[in-house]
Regions:
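Class I SAM-dependent methyltransferase SAM/SAH-binding core
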Residues: 1-14
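Active-site micro-motifs of SAM-dependent methyltransferase domains
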Residues: 14, 31, 59
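Glycine-rich phosphate-binding loop signature in dinucleotide/nucleotide-binding domains
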Residues: 17-20
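Conserved acidic residues
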Residues: 22, 50
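A conserved beta-strand element that flanks and buttresses the S-adenosyl-L-methionine
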Residues: 25
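A short, conserved alpha-helix within the catalytic core of class I
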Residues: 33-48, 54
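C-terminal alpha-helical "lid/dimerization" subdomain adjacent to the S-adenosyl-L-methionine
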Residues: 55-117
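Core SAM-dependent methyltransferase catalytic element
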Residues: 109-137
Length: 137
C-alpha cells in the first residue's frame, strides 16, 4: 500500500513536531540560511529523519557566484528571500556535513536541472544532490 506524501512548509516544520520521517528532502534552501550556519538545520533534520536528501548549488569562483546570485534574485525577488553572498564549494559542503555529524552516502554533482535559457545561464556544474544519513553514536 502506498503512503501519501505530505508537504510541510519549513516555517512550520519544527514547531511541536515529534514525528519521525523516513526521508526529508530539502531543495535549494540551505544556501539561503548561510553556508556557515546551515549545519544547524541539518542537525535538526537528522533528529527527525535517518535520511536527508539535499539539492543545492556549488559555486566555482567569482563569476559563477554572480550567476547564482542573479538567478536567485530573479527566482526569489517576489518572496523577500535572502540572497546569499556565498554558495557552497566542494570543500565548504564537506565541512558542513562534518559539522552536522552526518555521513554522506552519495553525492551527484553536475546534473541538468533546467531546460532552455536557464540551463544556458546556470548550467549543470552548479547543481548537486547529496544523500546524507544519520550516524548513530
Amino acid at each position: 500500500k502506498r503512503k501519501k506524501l505530505k508537504y510541510i512548509q519549513y516555517n512550520d516544520f519544527f514547531k511541536n513536531n515529534k514525528k519521525k520521517y523516513d526521508l526529508v528532502i530539502i531543495v535549494d534552501v540551505l544556501h539561503h540560511v548561510g553556508i556557515e550556519s546551515s549545519y544547524k538545520i541539518l542537525k535538526k533534520l537528522s533528529k527527525i529523519s535517518k535520511n536527508i536528501i539535499v539539492k543545492d548549488h556549488f559555486e566555482h569562483g567569482f563569476f559563477s557566484r554572480q550567476l547564482l546570485r542573479f538567478v536567485d534574485f530573479y527566482a526569489n525577488y517576489a518572496y523577500d528571500v535572502n540572497i546569499p553572498k556565498k554558495y557552497y564549494d566542494y570543500s565548504s559542503w564537506k565541512k558542513t556535513i562534518k559539522k552536522s555529524r552526518l555521513k554522506e552516502v552519495k553525492i551527484i554533482e553536475s546534473f541538468q536541472q533546467h531546460d532552455g535559457l536557464f540551463n544556458f545561464i546556470l548550467n549543470k556544474k552548479h547543481h548537486f544532490v547529496s544523500h546524507l544519513k544519520h550516524v548513530k553514536k
